Amino acid sequence: MKKWNQENCYIHTPYYINFASSNDLVRMSAPKIVREELERGNLIGAKYIMTHLGSSKDFTREEGLKMTTVGIGQILKGYKGATQLLLEISAGAGNTIGSTFEELKYILNHIDILIYGYEVGICLDSAHMFASGYDIKNKDGFKKIIEIIKKTVGLERIKLIHANDSKIELGGRKDRHDHIGDGKIGQGGFVNLASVFKCDFIAETKDDKVEEDIRILKDIRNNL
């Protein structure tokens, strides 16, 4: 990180992670894979590791949430490293787990009981939130979202923002990133996010304009 003049380093787990898969191999290997990523992250000094939670396609919602909670508990059992695990909110496609703050609250509350003294954080993806029906574009809608967060996971649990515009309309339940200002959210949504969340923002957009996305995000933060 010193070589590249980076203050912080973040790692994303593989996208095939699924704590609620009906495939025993996929479900049972997920905790081991994420734990290994955590340990590697700790070795290189990564601040956070974020993971998707998967989908409960062949189980009820309650069963999927319980399996996810058990899996995350297995990841953290005995873990003493400094790198913190973050759960990423999903876009709500199909039967994906963690597309609402209520579901994330359920998972966090049960993890807090299983692994006393370790705090799991949350990674917000702006495109995922918008696709799940959270209107971060509208100021009044955004205020309501902040109140929901306060009553569920808590603002203090939000550790990182994936700053992506969305090609999908509000509530469209698909994960399609767009460049900042080019999608359905617009720059105003990122002004809303930056006005509340002072954590790092990461652009997950295509290489053709990612530098422009970063410039826009920096301008937004500098002009608040």
Regions found by a protein language model. Give the residues of each.
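Terminal, non-globular segments
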Residues: 1-9, 16-17, 24-27, 79, ...
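Short, electropositive alpha-helical surface patch
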Residues: 1-5, 25-36, 61-74, 100-109, ...
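Short, well-ordered coil/turn segments that N-cap beta-strands
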Residues: 3-9, 43-47, 80-84, 116-120, ...
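Histidine-centered catalytic micro-motifs
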Residues: 9-17, 53, 124-126, 163-165
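Short, solvent-exposed loop/turn segments at secondary-structure junctions
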Residues: 16, 56, 92, 128-129, ...
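Active-site acidic/histidine proton-transfer and metal-coordination neighborhood
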Residues: 20-121
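Acidic/histidine-rich catalytic cores of soluble enzymes
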Residues: 74-177
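A short, acidic, flexible beta-alpha connecting loop/helix-capping segment that sits on the rim
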Residues: 200-211
